[in-house]
Amino acid sequence: MNYKLNKSAAIISQTTNDYDHTVGYHDISPFNKNNDNILTMHRFPLKNTDLSNNIKAEICLWHSRESIIEKIDETDSWSWEQGSRLQWLNCEEIIYNIKKNKKNKSCIYNINNKQKKILESPIYSLSQKNKKFLYINYSRIRHFWKNYGYEFTDKIEFERQPANDGVYLSDFDNNQKLVLSIEKAIDICGLKKSNQYFFIAHPTFSPKGDKFVSLLRFINESGILISYFICTDLNKDTHTLLAREKVSHFEWVDNDTIVVWCRNLSPKYEKIRFNKYLEKYFVSSIKKILKLLKPGIQQKLISTHYHMIKLDNPYKLIKLNENNLTEDGHPQVSKNGRFLITDTYANKIGYQKLLLYDLIKNKTHFVGEFKVDSYLKNKNLKYDLHPRWNHNSNKISIDSSHDGSRQSYIIDIQELINTIS
């Protein structure tokens, strides 16, 4: 069996298997706010495993009830993990990244009148509240972290700690400004003495759009990704370091609360990661031993869990239900704020779990598990479920390869929610 579902959940729609179809990352809902039947979608040649942008991603609308996938454009600004950052701007318009004249830009497309508007900057995170968006240097991301950036044709020499690169804020009239430079982020994190090549990833607006969080990252001498989690208040022009060293996926619960998978250790441990000899001989040996243990035991030993961070007391990390949420995943909070949906990475036999966490009752419920197809595993390519809510908080969109190719699915969990509420 290549998948299993909770008896109170049901797959109600899936994309056609004549192409690969994928939504993208876990932080964007593909559902139209006024019509659950219309979802944003990327389309690729069937069983594509080429991570280069030589193959264009088709920008599509999935009319799920009618099983119709409508192509509206194509782009070569896409990544394996996140697509083109395709998302709804409002109920009539979508926005996605494109490349024009060798520069990364974004395009607004009106689904009613078919008109396009080209913006001078690419998009990462959108705030519908204040009609602004954040973006980053996708070429720098691609250079240091291949699965998340976009190909670039010109040879670029990157600085280690640039003052003129980082997170940018833009409106839809092309007014742009740098709101967090890589140099500033390095200073915030106390890393000015480091000689690493840094980059900033995942800048994400708070629900009200007055704050954003981002990850300052670098890859150390052992090939380990090191991360620092920063919150920027745009109104106050302040920055707060929230977590360090091991920080993975996160989600805003409300405008002042964040859930994040991270390690909660003292800064003393951080110094080990900057000592190349201790890192090479001590930490690497410990990691080999940990890999032999079950995920839950691993997390207890290395203090890595889902934590809640409240911005009014950011230095007190509140651990979530560790007995059931013992693995890193891709969380998204329901629109009504009651539930968190997340996944896990594939286990040793290739299955990824889909889990529903009740934020009020502090309890986790099994939704399903799905097997990564062998053609991806054989090429050492992961394909995450990246679960995403609809706007009524009763359906989930996932990407999965359990049927033999990359496809998207809609799972109705209303009955499951009714039984646990």
Which positions does each model-derived feature cover?
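Surface-exposed loop and turn segments in beta-propeller and other repeat-based domains
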Residues: 12-21, 72-80, 176-196, 318-324, ...
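Blade-loop segments of beta-propeller domains
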Residues: 20-27, 45, 51-104, 374
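Blade-terminus and WD-like Trp-Asp/Gly-His loop motifs, strongest in beta-propeller folds
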Residues: 28-38, 78-101, 124-132, 136-137, ...
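Short, conserved, GDST-rich strand-edge loop motifs in beta-rich repeat architectures
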Residues: 41-55, 136-164, 214-225, 263-301, ...
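Asp-box/WD-like beta-propeller blade repeats and closely related beta-sheet repeat scaffolds
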Residues: 75-87, 91-166, 179-195
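Conserved blade-ending motifs and adjacent loop-strand segments that build the rim/top face
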Residues: 243-249, 318-332, 363-388
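Loop/turn-rich, solvent-exposed surfaces of beta-rich toroidal or solenoidal domains
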Residues: 291-306, 318-363
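Blade-level signature of beta-propeller repeat domains, shared across WD40, Kelch, NHL, RCC1
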Residues: 383-421
